[in-house]
UniProtKB/Swiss-Prot annotation:
Binds 2 Mg(2+) ions per subunit. Its EC number is 2.5.1.10, 2.5.1.1. Farnesyl pyrophosphate synthase; part of the second module of ergosterol biosynthesis pathway that includes the middle steps of the pathway. ERG20 catalyzes the sequential condensation of isopentenyl pyrophosphate with dimethylallyl pyrophosphate, and then with the resultant geranylpyrophosphate to the ultimate product farnesyl pyrophosphate. The second module is carried out in the vacuole and involves the formation of farnesyl diphosphate, which is also an important intermediate in the biosynthesis of ubiquinone, dolichol, heme and prenylated proteins. It catalyses: isopentenyl diphosphate + dimethylallyl diphosphate = (2E)-geranyl diphosphate + diphosphate; isopentenyl diphosphate + (2E)-geranyl diphosphate = (2E,6E)-farnesyl diphosphate + diphosphate. GO terms for biological process: ergosterol biosynthetic process; farnesyl diphosphate biosynthetic process; geranyl diphosphate biosynthetic process; isoprenoid biosynthetic process. Its cofactor is Mg(2+). This is Farnesyl pyrophosphate synthase. It comes from Candida albicans (strain SC5314 / ATCC MYA-2876). The gene is ERG20.
Length: 351
């Protein structure tokens, strides 16, 4: 078994323990069996199915900060840090269950969205709340005695609210029914991706590992924030680029940003340089559900040289981030390797 697969298996084993713990808490409340089974089914359906990047990076970051590798952590230590990883995966599950209902999505991670599973429907709203609630039940059980317990709570509450702000701006900017490209701007795009993605996917995993490692100086949290937030923005810009220019075989999904009227980086770059005629073509075709309109937009993006603009942006942001990482002050226990590892996962990825 490869190291990567072994790390994933060990992480998944902890999830089984957590489901059992949550189940026992419901048993202690004298919850009827059918409700316990429902919650367990929701946990298993919605939480462990993705790539688990966010959760695993808490473990990897903790290991780097403690001069070791994740496979060398003893079981007690491993379970505790993996629990923080699973808390992010529960947060992600909570967002996705709700997000899929808001977007009326059909599938998620290769299976029907939870609200479309037979018999679930609007109960999925309450299920999403329970996935979030599970985070705090688990944190209380495992971290109540730790000096950084309140820091963990603050961090989860703040990042959750930031993500919801990003989601709000996304929803009111990109209405699937009414296409209005005047609503789009690169400033809005930047706010959406930083708040909706960068905080919980990039900053949160590292900040959690730092608190657990006793690295809690605001100077250090700021050092990582100043790198991970732009890195998260770059990650999402890359995602927008791949949605339009990547092939389904390459990215593992069919890009839908154009048809969904998304306020993506690609359309915003096009709007900056389009002639009035080209703008008219975008007004007439962007956000339309048919393949022909989508293709017209894609052809125009190619014609406008968006690919080169992206590659130039990528090289400049990566050079800037590398320089920032080089200048990190490691005197209080922070390690450059943490940030180098994150950058390595994002730079030149193809899916």
């Amino acid at each position: 078994m490869s190291d990567k697969l072994a790390a994933r298996e060990r992480f998944l084993d902890v999830f089984e323990d957590l489901v059992e713990e949550l189940k026992q808490i419901l048993v202690s409340y004298n919850m009827p069996q059918e409700a316990i089974e429902w919650f367990v089914r929701s946990l298993n359906y919605n939480t462990p199915g993705g790539k688990l990047n966010r959760g695993l990076s808490v473990v990897d970051t903790f290991a780097i900060l403690n001069n070791t590798t994740s496979d060398k952590l003893n079981d007690t230590e491993y379970k505790k840090v993996a629990l923080l990883g699973w808390a992010i995966e529960l947060l992600q599950a909570y967002f996705l269950v709700a997000d899929d209902m808001m977007d009326q999505s059909k599938t998620r991670r290769g299976q029907p969205c939870w609200y479309l599973v037979e018999g679930v429907n609007n109960i999925a709203i309450n299920d999403s709340f329970m996935l979030e609630g599970a985070i705090y039940i688990l944190l209380k059980k495992h971290f109540r005695q730790d000096p950084y317990y309140v820091d963990l709570l603050d961090l989860f509450h703040e990042v959750t609210f930031q993500t919801e702000l990003g989601q709000l701006l996304d929803l009111i900017t990109a209405d699937e029914e009414i296409v209005d490209l005047d609503k789009f701007s690169l400033e809005k795009h930047s706010f959406i991706v930083i708040f909706k993605t960068a905080y919980y996917s990039f900053y949160l995993p590292v900040a959690l590992a730092m608190y657990m490692s006793g690295i809690n100086d605001e100077k250090d949290l700021k050092q990582v924030r100043d790198i991970l937030i732009p890195l998260g923005e770059y990650f999402q810009i890359q995602d927008d680029y791949l949605d339009c220019f990547g092939t389904p075989e390459q990215i593992g999904k069919i890009g839908t940003d154009i048809k969904d009227n998304k306020c993506s980086w690609v359309i915003n770059q096009a709007l900056l340089i389009a002639t009035p005629e080209q703008r008219q073509l975008l007004d007439n075709n962007y956000g339309k559900k048919d393949d022909e309109s989508e293709q017209k937009c894609k052809d125009l993006f190619k014609q406008l040289g968006i690919e080169k603009i992206y590659h130039d942006y990528e090289e400049s942001i990566v050079a800037k981030l590398r320089k920032q990482i080089d200048q990190i002050d490691e005197s209080r226990g922070l390690k450059k390797d943490v940030l180098t590892a994150f950058l390595g996962k994002v730079y030149k990825r193809s899916k």
